[in-house]
Each structure stands twice: as structure tokens, then as C-alpha cells.
């Protein structure tokens, strides 16, 4: 079941929270709505569910206009962040609830309901918890019950509002993998809201990055990560180091140091320079592409790499994050090095300049 969102806007009073949103979600696709608080992602999800009404625009499911259709008629399953389980009902009864309140002509008999519920509990690995109450479950177990309940009525579309936000990091990681596997098995169309970049990157087929009621970028996790469409996306997705610089001719000046470029950019003057921690080069001696002196202040092993924090010596006031991969010569605290990078993203205000490479030789 595909979802077509065409020019949807939403106002709460005089405040606009969605501005002319257009987005297509393909059948069987899992899409993440990713953005900071106030970006409009939950409002958009609730409009798809029928829990909010758009001010303008059209919403269609597989070509059928559902803009005015009641939520109960949309065949949409909704999973909330805080589970919304019935405390007085057992796990079995919570999962069965949606089936028991279907219109009589669509309602299965009790034997069919029991069979369906037990199949779902087996799928979410909670068969032995059927007679327990929500108060007897962990957070991760409650969320799996909520997901089974949403799937019980065989929705065409599954919507999830920060489904793992209330769980600790380890449980979130396990449930993300489990949800991805479940999606690949059942092939339902799904849209989920998150502010967790790692969650969006790991689970989604495509990521929709939102900001202040607008869509900044839509793409696969690899596309939005490698080719950010705006400065906001660049800064929002993952850790990035930010330096103030200036372009003079074919030189990039950072903290009084001259870094030669392989071209002479059209733009001259002040720029903001962005480098990801793993794009930073670090050498014991200064080079053309690594002329900036630093001192190592923190070394944190992370399995197959080391996360370093280095303090610039006289050219930048904030510490710089660096990822180090060479296990044969791991830096120690107090060591002095020189950093730079052959690839940097440069912005003049919000305008992205062409990605520039530092010259390797004079």
C-alpha cells in the first residue's frame, strides 16, 4: 500500500507546523521521518493516521483519496512511544482487542482470534507471556506487545511514533534489528518518527529529514549521509567538526595556516569548514594537507577504532573529534600532532560551495 502526500500544510491556530509537504512512500517501504523537536514529523504521522486533519493538501493511499476518511476506516496500525497498553488486560487480551471490536461482519470467531493472537505472540517471541499483565513486563516486551496489537488487524500501513524512545540503549538496539527483520518478512508499508539518527540509518529504506515544518532532504541512509542537501542536514546527521575559514585565491586559511586547494574557487572570502571525524588526517609532522597543530587530550578505544579528542594549539578554541584506525601506533594523551583533511565541505552562510580537495603537493 503506497502513500501519496501532496502539498499538505497544517496550522494550529496561526502557527504553521507543516508547509506544503509532498512525499511518496512506496508499497512495502519503511521510511523514517527524522528531525529535531518541532520539525513537524509527529504531526505528519498523525495526519497519515487520521488522528489530525491537514489544513490544506491531499493524502492518498494507493491512489485513493483518504483526506476526509475517518481513522478507523484507513486500515492503519499505530504504535505509540509509551505503549498505550490496557493495564487491566492480559497480554493476550491486549493483542486481541482490535479484533474483538471489529464490526460484526468482519469480526473473526473466538477460535480464529485465539489462533491469530498466538501466531502474533510467537512472532514477537512472547508466547509464554500471554497471561501476564503489562505491569509484569519490561519496556521492550511492552513495545513488542504494542506492535503485535497493531499488526493483529492486518493493517495496510504501520505507523510508529518514536517506538523505542522510552527504552534504554541496549534494548533499543535489539528492537531495531528485530523490527527490520519483521518488516523484511511481512513487507508492510511503514512510516516511523524518530530523532535518533542511528535508528533512522539502521532501520529505514529511506530517510526524510525534516526541519521547521519542511522537508530538507529525502534519500537512502547512504545518500543523506554522503551527500547532504543542506547545511542543516550536514550538521544534524552525525558528529562533525566546524571551523571558521577564509578562501584567498587558491588557499584556504584556517587559524592563520594556509592550506593549498587544487582549484581556485569562484567564491572568495569567509567560509564555514566542516570535516567528519573519520575524514581528518593526523600526522606527527606538518604536511601541506595537515598543517594544523593539536595536542591529544582524550583517547577512547571503540573496538576496531579509537575516538580521539584533540585540542588545537593557538588556532581554534574548541576541541576536535578525530577517529583513528591504525592499531600499530595509537596516540596517547599529551602527544602533539598536525591535522587536516583532503576533503572538506564548505559553506558560505547556508549556501554550499563545491566540495574542495586540498592539494597534495605544492
UniProtKB/Swiss-Prot annotation:
Its EC number is 7.3.2.3. One of its GO terms (cellular component) is ATP-binding cassette (ABC) transporter complex. InterPro entries: AAA+_ATPase, ABC_SmlMolc_Importer, ABC_transporter-like_ATP-bd, ABC_transporter-like_CS, Mo/tungstate-bd_C_term_dom, P-loop_NTPase, Sulph_transpt1. The keyword Oxidoreductase does not apply. It holds the Pfam family ABC_tran. It is a peripheral membrane protein. Keywords: ATP-binding, Cell inner membrane, Cell membrane, Membrane, Nucleotide-binding, Sulfate transport, Translocase, Transport. Part of the ABC transporter complex CysAWTP involved in sulfate/thiosulfate import. Responsible for energy coupling to the transport system. Belongs to the ABC transporter superfamily. Sulfate/tungstate importer (TC 3.A.1.6) family. This is Sulfate/thiosulfate import ATP-binding protein CysA. It comes from Photorhabdus laumondii subsp. laumondii (strain DSM 15139 / CIP 105565 / TT01) (Photorhabdus luminescens subsp. laumondii). The gene is cysA.
